Amino acid sequence: MFIGIVSLFPEMFRAITDYGVTGRAVKKGLLNIQSWSPRDFAHDRHRTVDDRPYGGGPGMLMMVQPLRDAIHAAKAAAGEGAKVIYLSPQGRKLDQAGVSELATNQKLILVCGRYEGVDERVIQTEIDEEWSIGDYVLSGGELPAMTLIDSVARFIPGVLGHEASAIEDSFADGLLDCPHYTRPEVLEGMEVPPVLLSGNHAEIRRWRLKQSLGRTWLRRPELLENLALTEEQARLLAEFKTEHAQQQHKHDGMA
């Protein structure tokens, strides 16, 4: 997969190219990340990349010419079929469904804004889609771009050590992930749920699904509103709610 980055701070992406899952993907040749800085396309000796907005107001905008030239260079390197994405608070909010959708593209170009943003005409002429990672403001698009790269890379075959990992991630099926445990079996009096030690794979699957449903109901109930639960899922969620109510009643009685 090819990912081109247009950023004033390409050095920030060493966190992606040199470390962790994405770093291994780059080393294996599964992920090709290249970057272009608008500063390299500035025409003046000061390498100016910002300019005042028409109409006044605080802050500066990224200058059109260096930014467009950097995007064009990235497009030329990517070849036909590259999707150009601008990381923006006004964009579609990134979720697991969106990540899965983006992962079907073999070529992405991520444009990272700075200052107060970019000229609207650049968005109209150069950008295919706008994406956001949340309803808050950051200093630039680099961190959202890294978030997008990390999440999309998990779908590239061979990137994860276990191919089922991406399928079983939180949100992969619209639900939060279930709790996980490793050694020791007992930690400060807290025991690993016995079912996970039983070796009964059918019961383990059932327990994990129940916990996933229950955790979603407790922490992100709005996610359940968009799901058509199977008969088994509805039954397990009802069991979880009953067990949770009993635990709460027991806890309240001890208080």
Curated annotation (Swiss-Prot):
Its EC number is 2.1.1.228. Keywords: Cytoplasm, Methyltransferase, S-adenosyl-L-methionine, Transferase, tRNA processing. The keyword Transferase applies. S-adenosyl-L-methionine binds at residues 113, 133-138. Pfam families: tRNA_m1G_MT (PF01746). It is found in: Cytoplasm. Its main location: cytoplasm. It catalyses: guanosine(37) in tRNA + S-adenosyl-L-methionine = N(1)-methylguanosine(37) in tRNA + S-adenosyl-L-homocysteine + H(+). InterPro entries: Alpha/beta_knot_MTases, tRNA_m1G_MeTrfase_C_sf, tRNA_m1G_MeTrfase_TrmD, tRNA_m1G_MTases_N, tRNA_MeTrfase_TRMD/TRM10. GO terms for cellular component: cytosol. GO terms for biological process: tRNA N1-guanine methylation. GO terms for molecular function: tRNA (guanine(37)-N1)-methyltransferase activity. Transmembrane segments: none annotated. PANTHER family: TRNA (GUANINE-N(1)-)-METHYLTRANSFERASE (PTHR46417:SF1). Specifically methylates guanosine-37 in various tRNAs. Homodimer. Belongs to the RNA methyltransferase TrmD family. This is tRNA (guanine-N(1)-)-methyltransferase. It comes from Salmonella typhimurium (strain LT2 / SGSC1412 / ATCC 700720).
